[in-house]
């Protein structure tokens, strides 16, 4: 249910809908065509009468009206604007001009025209929506109070609830109207859309099926069905649902075409994003958000930030995405300010009454506490939703880090090893946490193998430091000594020599206690011989003497 655009679209070409062929010789009357909602036929009749000199007083008004209902807002605007400039024009022209301007995203012009129109329920509904567009709460409440308990006004109220993310309130209104008007089939699409927004995708499908049984070629309904399939299954299943629309010989209005192009990019995991999404950024609200997501997936955090920094968030999705972008930029730049902003956005969504019990709301609270390094609280929220994310690599990455941060290394290791995404598995954060889990779980050799697979870099040096220090603390002296030995070769710092010396002595003590094979002594001596420190000869003499006494070849 797209009530309006975000961008004026007067310059767009609008496709004319194919004219239906009418059987029989009888010329239909205008009121019959309007009752059948055959607006193409109505325009054809009106234009024919005008050509043969039989046009009536309100011919142009009806042409503008029919063009509006065909989605040809550009032509409708031209007609109503011309009528408004005539002396003594029909007062209805102003509210019609306002409606057309509204649907073209020309909200200022719509407001000016609406205020010139006579007071009516339609004028009040339009001003109600304009107040929402202008974020004018005071005006919004004034026009809200003028709404009556009639279908049009209640539908208008439901759409405002929808746009303000009050989906349950909108559902309640639609269901109440449906109870009394079973033939209002299109309301099922609106109900289905609300359930979609509430993440009840299976319920949305059930409600949508009622409408599609009667109108199987509905562009909006099929698009929503595809979106449900995307959430329930995958992008291929979603794209298959749109195939009929893409192959159709009928021409949906231009906005529906743009919506389909946009959604195909999402279904195809961002394929073609840079070609399709930029022109739609100010037309389809989600296009900006999806382009930001695309940049984040390409690790272009700065470009994502540039695109979203001036967006004033008004929906949970916008707050969440601004939080994610600020968190990513904060980590990349080491900026406490960006991390603080991210934490506040996450807390705002996760703590709100409407989102606190939703999956995204709980993810937000987990993210908030993650940035605050309160990992026990992180786990409270992640544990409550983990059943929904068993195979989600990003979720498991964060979940495993939180497990490890509270010292639950056994479970953390298990979750880390569930991750399949190669990009995550090559990330230093993943490697360092997994290495720590291996060491804490008495598997130092596996941590060492992680290091051996890395290319020489600043990250491999940092991992070596972690292995050296963690293995030393845990009494895995053999791998601590090997790590300190390489560190000493790369950087002849006294602290690395001291670490290696302590680890080598630790290995010797374990040999004496029978917890390490005697043959390891030879490797310890080789490690010590690679050091130029004066203390090393004394240690080597003691070890060699013990080896000779215990018949250990050195």
Curated annotation (Swiss-Prot):
TPR repeats lie at residues 57-90, 92-125, 151-184, 468-501. It is found in: Cell projection, Cilium. Signal peptide: none annotated. The keyword Transcription regulation does not apply. Keywords: Cell projection, Cilium, Protein transport, Repeat, TPR repeat, Transport. It holds the Pfam family TPR_8. One of its GO terms (cellular component) is cilium. Component of the intraflagellar transport (IFT) complex B required for transport of proteins in the motile cilium. Required for transport of specific ciliary cargo proteins related to motility, while it is neither required for IFT complex B assembly or motion nor for cilium assembly. Plays a key role in maintaining the integrity of the IFT complex B and the proper ciliary localization of the IFT complex B components. Essential for maintaining proper microtubule organization within the ciliary axoneme. This is Intraflagellar transport protein 56. It comes from Xenopus tropicalis. The gene is ift56.
């Amino acid at each position: 249910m797209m009530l309006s655009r975000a961008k004026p679209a007067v310059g767009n070409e609008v496709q004319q809908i194919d004219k239906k062929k009418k059987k029989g010789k009888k010329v239909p009357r205008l009121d019959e065509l309007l009752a059948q909602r055959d607006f193409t036929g109505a325009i054809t009749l009106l234009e024919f009468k005008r050509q043969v000199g039989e046009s009536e007083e309100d011919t142009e008004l009806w042409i503008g009206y029919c063009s509006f209902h065909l989605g040809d807002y550009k032509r409708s605007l031209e007609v109503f604007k011309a009528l408004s400039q005539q002396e003594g024009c029909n007062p209805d022209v102003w509210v019609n001009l306002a409606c057309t301007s509204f649907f073209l995203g020309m909200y200022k012009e719509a407001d000016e025209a609406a205020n010139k129109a006579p007071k009516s329920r339609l004028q009040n509904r339009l001003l109600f929506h304009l107040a929402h567009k202008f974020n004018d709460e005071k005006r919004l409440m004034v026009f809200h109070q003028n709404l009556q308990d009639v279908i049009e006004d209640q539908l208008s109220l439901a759409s405002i609830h929808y746009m303000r993310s009050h989906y349950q309130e909108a559902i309640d209104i639609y269901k109440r109207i449906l109870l009394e008007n079973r033939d209002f089939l299109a309301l099922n699409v609106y109900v289905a859309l609300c359930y979609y927004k509430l993440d009840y995708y299976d319920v949305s499908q059930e409600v949508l099926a009622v409408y599609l049984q009667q109108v199987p070629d509905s562009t909006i309904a099929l698009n929503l069905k595809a979106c449900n399939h995307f959430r329930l299954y995958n992008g291929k299943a979603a794209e298959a649902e749109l195939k009929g629309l893409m192959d159709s010989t009928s021409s949906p209005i231009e906005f529906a075409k743009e919506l389909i192009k946009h959604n195909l990019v999402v279904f195809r995991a961002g394929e073609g994003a840079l070609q399709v999404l930029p022109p739609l950024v100010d037309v389809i609200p989600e296009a900006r958000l999806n382009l930001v997501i695309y940049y984040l997936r390409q690790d272009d955090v700065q470009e994502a930030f540039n695109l979203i920094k001036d967006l004033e968030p008004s929906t949970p999705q916008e707050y969440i995405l601004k939080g994610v972008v600020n968190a990513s930029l904060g980590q990349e730049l080491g900026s406490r300010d960006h991390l603080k902003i991210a934490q506040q956005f996450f807390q705002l969504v996760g703590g709100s009454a409407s989102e606190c019990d939703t999956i995204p709301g709980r993810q937000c609270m987990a993210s908030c506490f993650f940035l605050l390094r309160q990992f026990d609280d992180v786990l409270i929220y992640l544990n409550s939703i983990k059943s929904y994310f068993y195979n989600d690599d990003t979720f498991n990455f964060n979940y495993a880090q939180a497990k490890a941060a509270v010292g639950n290394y056994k479970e953390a290791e298990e979750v880390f090893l569930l991750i399949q995404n190669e990009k995550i598995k090559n990330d230093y954060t993943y490697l360092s946490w997994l290495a720590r889990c291996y060491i804490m779980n008495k598997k130092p050799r596996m941590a060492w193998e992680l290091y051996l697979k890395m290319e020489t870099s600043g990250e491999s040096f940092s991992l070596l430091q972690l292995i050296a220090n963690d293995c030393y603390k845990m009494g895995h002296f053999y791998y601590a000594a090997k790590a300190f030995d390489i560190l000493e070769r790369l950087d002849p710092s006294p602290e690395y020599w001291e670490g290696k010396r302590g680890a080598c002595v630790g290995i010797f003590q374990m040999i004496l206690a029978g917890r390490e094979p005697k043959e390891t002594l030879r490797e310890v001596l080789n490690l010590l011989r690679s050091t130029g420190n004066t203390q090393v000869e004394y240690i080597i003499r003691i070890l060699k003497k013990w080896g000779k006494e215990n018949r250990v070849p050195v």
